[in-house]
Amino acid sequence: MKKLIKFEKDNCKPCEMVSEYLNSKNVEFEAINAYNDPIRASKMKVRSVPTLMLLDNEGNEIRRIVGYNPQEIDLMIEELKGE
């Protein structure tokens, strides 16, 4: 099963906007604070936040979006729901 994860940090308006957008679309995602979990962020090569990643059922990255881009997020949601 594909999975959506979002790397974020506290007091980040674009991070909040991504979460609000995903919630408005009823999309489940895992939120990870990149500053509280720097090892995982580094392992996933996260360089800035928000970073939204779509992973396959083995944890391999399928797609990545950096920043707030509703059109790109919609494409990612379609791919997520397409299974």
What residue ranges belong to the model's regions?
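Local sequence-structure signature of Cys/Sec-based thiol-disulfide redox active-site neighborhoods
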Residues: 1-27
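Non-catalytic, surface beta->alpha helical segment in thiol-disulfide oxidoreductase systems
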Residues: 56-83
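Short amphipathic alpha-helix with an adjacent loop that forms part of the alpha/beta core around
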Residues: 41-45, 77-80
